[in-house]
Amino acid sequence: MRNSVAVLALAVALCPGLAQAQAGDNTVKKIEEYRQALVDGNPAELWEARGEDLWKRKRGPKQVSLEACDLGLGAGVIKGAYAVLPRYFADADRVMDLESRLVHCMMTLQGMSRADATRRPFGNGTERSDMEALVAFITAESKGVVMNVPQRHAKEREAYALGKQIFFFRGGPHDFSCATCHSEGGKRIRLQDLPNLTETKDAQRAYTSWPAYRVSQGELRSMQWRLFDCFRQQRFPALEFTSEASVALTMFLARNANGAPFAAPAIKR
């Protein structure tokens, strides 16, 4: 009798925990079902179409298009280009991600000033960003291509090492780092699961799903924006668009995603 009472007491004690776990699992399932329901009508296609027009349109003081821009696989080649970025570019003697390379091409091919090329890196809900549209178009051309970010050049390896250092650096008023939220499994902020970016599968799944259309914002968001917003949430100083730090952190994340097929532009809450 005593054993039966003890078992019953233990079951009662565990019930709240079991109920919470089941509720949590059900919430995750519902969120995933919601995301899948949105995939077939991803508004990112609108950004892709505008990006293609911007890629082919003659713009800037020189009135030329971006079709001769070398994104790493040769002038004008965009198929699969995002899957090998960031990388070292000899003509600039530095490592570049997609956005910094596009800025470079706008300046060298189209004759734009850096200020003009970077005037609106992110849309604000009212004014759309040309850069985000170009990113949508170019990244879509790598969908299904396996990530293969290189580390052959010394500067590529230096960028990866710097990105790793930034990922684990703690600072700001909350003594946060990227790793605070993204180095352990099972973490979540509100309804958002936080991937463990130190684990290969999570790192691959996370990186290959950006850029993405954010339903809550009505905007397509790039990886540069994702990093900028992470810094904002940590109360860090603003991450400068296409800065060495932003490219290095992108290199760290992209390289860790090697071996996975690219799957963006995606759609997120």
Residue ranges and their predicted role:
Residues Q22-L46, K56-A133, K143-G144, F169-R269:
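Electron-transfer interface patches adjacent to heme c in soluble/periplasmic c-type cytochromes
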Residues Q36-E52, G144-K164:
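Short, charged low-complexity linear segments at domain edges
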Residues G17-A21:
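Sec/Tat signal peptide C-region and signal peptidase I cleavage site
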Residues L134-E141, P150-Q151:
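Hydrophobic, well-structured mid-protein blocks that either form specific transmembrane helices
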Residues M1-S4:
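Positively charged n-region of N-terminal signal peptides that target proteins for export
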Residues A6-P16:
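Bacterial N-terminal signal peptides
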